[in-house]
Amino acid sequence: MTDKFYFYGLFWGILLFVFLQHMQGNVPPTPLPPLSSEDLVNRSATPQLPPTCDGNATTFGGVKFPKKKTPPACACKVLEKFSCMGSFGCIGYSWGCSCCCFKSCKNVTTSPLLQ
């Protein structure tokens, strides 16, 4: 009795697999809208700059984030980058200054060769 159920399950499983593979090949790809030259100019004109600190706030992507109290582990050193994790996700990395953390920092030590 169990051999019969096993055979039918295997048969319908293979049939379903073949059907799904066949349908996957028949779906036409969605074309992407063409990029205009204006879009290309706008993309190349916005460089991604690292965060900067002026003592009162951390600037990232043109937006200033006021410094919050951070754990002692967030005291940045020259050869370390600190991934700033908070309630809004990762804002970025801070280079040689106080971390741009909202809640907590995770210390990521990097080699000078990787910078």
UniProtKB/Swiss-Prot annotation:
Residues 1-25 form the signal peptide. Keywords: Signal. This is Protein E6A. It comes from Equine herpesvirus 2 (strain 86/87). The gene is 12.
